[in-house]
Amino acid sequence: PYFPPTRMKEEIKSNFDKLLTEYPSGMHVNSLLASKYFDVKQEYICVGNGAAELIKALMELFSGKIGVVYPTFEEYPNRKTTDDIVAYIPDNNDFTYSVDDLIHYFDHKQLSSLLLINPDNPSGNFIPFNQLLRLLEWSKAQQIALVVDESFVDFTDDSEKNTLLKNELLASYPQLVVVKSISKSYGVPGLRLGVLASSNEQLITTIKKDVSIWNINSFAEFYMQIFGKYEADYRNACQKFMIERSRFFNLLQEISFLRVIPSQA
């Protein structure tokens, strides 16, 4: 409810006729726009028609066993067969889990990839950056592709420290694939935008070739062109959301028959 601001929506409206009647630029320009906003190398990032398009392309490229933490966002496991999935279900009432839990469970499961939604959807469980580094080291040593969906990371405390969209980090862990929806925290699900990043440039190139030539429409492209100007508004909106989340959490705790699970999503 706090983003995008009225000024941003008015800017999009004022360009409606032009955006409606012109073709979008295509993947090269869209990747450049995303790389500038997220400060990630253009060779490391691609843009999708929502994260769902990128998830589909990514899952189709992966073979072998994939580790999945349940409950989860079903778009990922829906792209694989049941035989391909090694499921981990937390054995507690709060659906919480740690890096140690994941490593202990998946260590000898002969995975080719591991999916982590962080913060988790739908449980809201969150593994902080300093702990996540151990999972990155483990997956690198095991030669397991680690897919981290951080679509809700901007809702976390110290969110700028928690994102994995960093050139140095991506370069150090070529097995890491980061997926981020530009819908949830940005408040624009109708535009259908998402990004996928990895220093595995062969993977990025393959996905870019897999999606359609104009997978992002002109309105979504224009949004990426201008949203850097509204960065302060966006950060302020996220802070307002976190305050409201805390208020709502406290109100729910006052209801005697509810067991309220903490969330960073």
Indicate residue ranges for each PLM-predicted region:
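N-terminal small-domain helix-loop-helix segment of the aminotransferase-like
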Residues: 1-50
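Conserved beta-loop-alpha segment that forms the PLP phosphate-binding cup at the N-terminus of a helix
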Residues: 28, 42-66, 194
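PLP-dependent aminotransferase-like
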Residues: 53, 60-116
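PLP-dependent aminotransferase class I/II
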Residues: 11, 26, 175-261
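Short glycine-rich anion-binding loops that position phosphate/pyrophosphate groups of nucleotides
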Residues: 1, 51, 73, 118-122, ...
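Hydrophobic/aromatic residues located in beta-strands of well-ordered beta-sheets
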Residues: 45, 66, 85, 146, ...
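Active-site pre-lysine segment of PLP-dependent enzymes
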Residues: 97-107, 122-185
